[in-house]
Curated annotation (Swiss-Prot):
One biological process term in Gene Ontology: carbohydrate metabolic process
Name of protein: Alpha-amylase I
Binding site for Ca(2+): N356, R408, D417, H451
Cofactor binding note of this UniProt entry: Binds 1 Ca(2+) ion per subunit. Binds 1 Cl(-) ion per subunit.
Annotated stretches, region: Not found in other alpha-amylases: 17-260
Pfam families xrefs: Alpha-amylase, Alpha-amylase_C
Compartment(s) where it occurs, according to its Swiss-Prot or TrEMBL record: Secreted
Active site positions: D447, E484
Biased composition (Low complexity): 90-112
Length: 737
């Protein structure tokens, strides 16, 4: 029985939180009236047990009254966008910010341990309620003498605490939903009040009280008094917030600004596609190369279970069998570790997601996946999800790219075409993507969006969680989404149909830069690939992801054909990548490849088909069959150039048939020669007078330049000699004097 009294005492201690700044008298707030026997009545019973019973009974009545009188909270499609500015980010350990009022150390007595869960839950709610940043939090339970040990108090308070904790967790992700659940929460308050009353009555043994110190009795009486004010003020606060919600909330669920931010850390930019890399190798690359050199993020190849093909071709990753995280790159534990390590290095992770289709039929059935699942594509049977024939579009092949319905409802290369309008299919996709968000990813590359209806993708995107704030994302921010849509302006599906959903891959960029640096197009055409010059030619800059090549078109698949530059034409390829990183248009992605001669060839592997690690060669390039364009000095240093000039204007364009030059404010200058001839010319660099080291031909080492030195005069001009197919890039950090 002593244990029971300690439980009751602990519960009353937990309620000791004052909420100044809210006035809610018996007459109500905003037309809301509340009959309030608990707030205003005096307490007649002198016996503490009777007093507890009385207060519990009144607490129950008030909870029921609040439930009846609280106005219906309106539904909001996406209230988080407006509400998130009030939320407090959490640290990677899950605790609130270190200077928050609730960061107190618990003492080790068992009474404190028994109530710590409730105390944390209540304090977290207070931290999340707008306008209560200065409100004192539930204090530590004072050290109580002569308290015996006791069991788990959750038998009495578990339902209440669990409801509060669940509501808090939901409220962090969706505050509108939290307030809509108030009515569901109040019955738990009523039920626990009944429980308290019943337990209190059973404790009416006067002999028990003789063994409890007077200090505890007085403390319990004081806590009972404060409990009434606690309920009054919390009710007032909830009512106040609930009534103001309609003015705060706006449906911005389809506002593209919520999905076009890649969440690069300060001083970082650019995405690297580490095609077919293992998770453990990606983590090391983040720590050793990407983070230190200012890369912003990594696109990883599809990570969920996919077909095991006889030849282990690269395209097997694009034939999913289930959504279990297990691939040639590693398992879920290794993936989670990679995300955390890359985040600590300042590098974000974006997952390539394949949800347009499932694995295609093979020569026989069943087919086997990388996690051990089997499937029968001919029967449309994928038990690892599970999907069956009802989850797919009718059998047909794409044969008319001018017909959007044919492109979206029929099969791409005999791959069974999922019906994304099917609610079950949507739910499975959303569960998978939300799980990845829980693991800390920053967003997704959505494969084959051209073959899915925008309205179906919209239905999926609006139901995704925010990015996980535990990984240092802004509270409530939506995941970055970049969608593969091949649109060269000649087919029935347009990339512009997808720009209100997120960023779109701009394949016209690949063709344009490839043409210029192959020499088939004049250099002055590069002006069309700047933010100001691209209007009407390319997608708006904020809606475009740009790249020189990707895993498809470097193998002759998709768009571009012979215009596409790859690592196999190194000099021109470096020029194209350097321009992509130096200009002010779009979000840039750099390809990181492995050597191949057969377009179907998979990544480097050992004798048991385990992917080889890239390793480090003497010059910091890759070994074991990997190309690693992102490690090439010219590209690595252009990432640093890009980060330094970020936000500055692109101006003073100086263009001829074979050269193209421009300034990035007064921070940097770059010039390109796309001809087979050496060209010497005077350029305005916009930089202060001095000697500068060209970061393409060399770098600054111990105050000297290992490459070409450019002399800039007092007017900011310089005479520069450009060898054939070359670049000169200088910026403030490369100044020697």
């Amino acid at each position: 029985m002593k244990q029971l009294l300690v439980i009751l005492y602990s519960a009353l201690v937990v309620t000791n939180a004052q909420l100044p700044g809210f006035s809610f008298g018996p007459s109500g707030f905003g037309g809301f009236s509340l009959s309030n026997p608990l707030f205003n009545a005096s307490f007649a019973p002198a016996n503490p047990v009777d007093r507890i019973s009385d207060i519990a009974s009144r607490f129950r009545d008030v909870a029921n009254n609040v439930q009846r009188n609280l106005p219906k909270i309106p539904q909001f499609t996406n209230p988080l966008s407006a509400f998130s500015r009030f939320a407090r980010p959490t640290s990677s350990s899950g605790s609130t910010n270190a200077n928050s009022n609730n960061n107190q150390n618990f003492n080790s007595n068992q009474a404190n341990e028994g109530t710590s869960g409730a105390r944390n839950a209540i304090n977290e709610v207070l931290n999340r309620i707008p306008g209560l940043s200065g409100v004192p939090r539930v204090p530590e339970i004072p050290k109580v003498p002569e308290i015996p040990s006791f069991g788990n108090p959750s038998d009495v308070f578990g339902p209440f605490v669990n409801s509060l904790r669940n509501m808090t967790n939901q409220g962090i992700n969706d505050p509108g939903q939290m307030f809509n659940q108030v009515n569901k929460f109040l019955p738990d308050v009523s039920r626990i009040a009944n429980s308290v009353a019943n337990y209190a009555k059973s404790a009416a043994n006067s002999g028990i009280w003789k063994n409890i110190s007077n200090d505890i009795k007085h403390e319990m009486q004081n806590r009972i008094e404060s409990m009434t004010q606690m309920l009054s003020n919390i009710t007032s606060a909830m009512k106040n917030i609930a009534q103001s919600l309609p003015n705060l909330m706006q449906d911005q669920s389809l506002n593209t600004t919520l999905r076009n931010q890649p969440f690069f850390f300060p001083g970082h930019s650019g995405i690297v596609h580490l095609f077919e890399w293992k998770f453990s190798d990606i983590a090391e690359e983040c720590e050793n190369v990407l983070g230190p050199n200012g890369y912003g993020g990594v696109q990883v190849s599809p990570i969920n279970e996919y077909l095991v093909s006889p030849s282990r071709a690269w395209w097997e990753r694009y034939q999913p069998i289930s959504f279990e995280i297990k691939s040639r790159s590693g398992n879920e534990k290794q993936f989670s570790d990679m995300v955390k390590r890359c985040m600590k290095a300042g590098v974000r992770i974006y997952v390539d997601v394949v949800v347009n289709h499932m694995a295609a039929p093979g020569a026989s059935a069943p087919l086997y996946g990388t996690a051990g699942s089997t499937c029968d594509p001919q029967a449309r049977d994928y038990p690892g999800v599970p999907f069956n024939r009802s989850h797919f579009h009718a059998d047909c092949q794409i044969n008319d790219y001018n017909n959007a319905t044919n492109v979206r409802n029929c099969e791409l290369a005999a791959l069974p075409d999922l019906d994304q309008s099917n609610r079950f299919v949507q739910n499975k996709i959303i569960q998978y993507l939300n799980h990845l968000l829980d693991l800390g990813v920053a967003g997704f590359r959505m494969d084959a969006c051209k073959h899915m209806r925008p309205e179906d993708l919209k239905s999926i995107y609006v139901r995704l969680k925010p990015v996980n704030a535990m990984f240092l994302f802004p509270p409530g921010a939506r995941p970055f989404i970049f969608q593969e849509v091949i649109d060269l302006g000649t087919e029935g599906v347009s990339a512009k149909e997808y720009t209100n959903l997120g960023v779109v891959t701009e394949f016209n960029w690949c063709i344009a830069v490839g043409g210029v640096f192959r020499g088939t197009t004049n250099a002055d055409a590069l002006e069309l690939l700047t933010k100001n010059g691209s209007a009407g030619v390319l997608l708006p800059s904020s809606q475009a992801l740009v790249f020189v090549d990707n895993h498809d078109n470097q193998r002759g698949h998709g768009a571009g054909g012979d215009s596409i530059l790859t690592y196999k034409t190194k000099r021109q390829y470096i020029q194209a990548v350097a321009f992509t990183l130096a200009t002010d248009y779009g979000i840039a992605r750099v390809m990181s490849s492995y050597n191949f001669s057969d377009p179907d060839q998979g990544p480097p592997q050992d004798t048991v088909q385990v992917i080889k690690s890239p390793g480090f060669a003497a010059n910091n390039s890759c070994s074991n069959g990997w190309v690693c364009e992102h490690r090439w000095p010219e590209i690595r240093k252009m990432i640093q150039f890009k980060n330094f000039v970020a936000g500055s204007s692109l101006d003073h364009i100086q263009a001829t048939q074979n050269t193209f030059a421009f300034c990035r404010g007064e921070k940097g200058f770059i010039v390109f020669n796309n001809s087979e001839n050496t060209i010497t010319q005077q350029y305005h660099t916009c930089l202060p007078q001095g000697q500068y080291c060209d970061i393409i031909s060399g770098e600054v080492s111990q105050s000297t330049c290992t490459g070409t030195v450019v002399n800039v005069d007092a007017n900011g001009d310089a005479e520069i000699t450009l060898p054939k197919n070359s670049i000169v890039a200088i910026y403030v950090p490369s100044r020697l004097s």
